[in-house]
């Protein structure tokens, strides 16, 4: 069978022909690439499609490359290592444009050059699963196997920073020596500028011997351990207690302290480039009042504060709102910033109107998108309100919800999609991050 394209999960897509020559059932083949002729084995059959494993590549695509990780194909952390990095970007751009058009009949005036950076060692945040497996004689620490609840037997990971990848085997040995080796379901990783933090989710208290092992490991590998006995709000630094987790935005002279459970961007290098492009697209003037929705700890808010007259950040999490305020004070930007905690998934037109007019907005929602915000703007446009901003820069981590929201802004609130492009925040995965700019009038 010939493979024509890739789907959102990086599976090759081919189509069988019926006996009369008309297009038949769609076949999704894991590991196959566009332009290839393959043989496959189906493992799930439905009336209109089948899912299949790749058996043999009979004609190879020019886009196929050797995966950079020995665990690729088993580990579920990556799905595109067999695809040339330039082709990955092109496919992600096509996914973005297809979603915009097919879901909302919207096309960008300009397609931006993709934002891309290092393909390896980029992942500064990760959630690793811990599993005590008696049959394997120890503990596994890593990502899940592809489409499985099993943990991959990983000895290194090429998308993690090299010092973290080199720590995986010692970390397995450490956990295997703890009394609660079977009562620690996950380890959350957060890498800062100077500190690497490991958050241990513990279901039972550590013994004194366990604590000694953690201290010795932290000293040897230059990491900081945090403990999480219950929910995310119970996280606290264990050892060393005084290390500060932070990342920097040197272009703006900003340092951003954060807790390892706070939301921060996975890819530090791409984050810096993304902020720079977002600010250039927003093109704030010295007299402008700016609004940053879903502001988190102030990742965009504080750089924006160096551009316009003032900026207001709104965030749904009280903890993140508090952190954003503290970061503004830490960086000497408190006088030019204001923060509020609001549920932006339930915001109304009246709520938006009550904020007053802001000249330009930056919107950076989670995967759910900004549905309520965009609906509210549509209602305000119908009312002839003067609070709608001239320009909106929208940073998205889901092309489907961006497309939905773009349709509301373009068809309901009088904006045009001036430009859009992909941001390769997660190389070698099918995750599509993007940035778009909307203009009104």
Swiss-Prot record:
The keyword Glycoprotein does not apply. S-adenosyl-L-methionine binds at residues 265, 294, 299, 315, 343, 364. The keyword Nucleotide-binding does not apply. Its EC number is 2.1.1.190. [4Fe-4S] cluster binds at residues 69, 75, 78, 157. It is an enzyme of class 2 (transferase). InterPro entries: 23S_rRNA_MeTrfase_RlmD, MeTrfase_TrmA_CS, NA-bd_OB-fold, SAM-dependent_MTases_sf, TRAM_dom, U5_MeTrfase_fam. Pfam families: tRNA_U5-meth_tr (PF05958). Residues 1-56 form the TRAM domain. GO terms for biological process: rRNA base methylation. Keywords: 4Fe-4S, Iron, Iron-sulfur, Metal-binding, Methyltransferase, rRNA processing, S-adenosyl-L-methionine, Transferase. Belongs to the class I-like SAM-binding methyltransferase superfamily. RNA M5U methyltransferase family. RlmD subfamily. Catalyzes the formation of 5-methyl-uridine at position 1939 (m5U1939) in 23S rRNA. HAMAP family: 23SrRNA_methyltr_RlmD (MF_01010). This is 23S rRNA (uracil(1939)-C(5))-methyltransferase RlmD. It comes from Cupriavidus necator (strain ATCC 17699 / DSM 428 / KCTC 22496 / NCIMB 10442 / H16 / Stanier 337) (Ralstonia eutropha). The gene is rlmD.
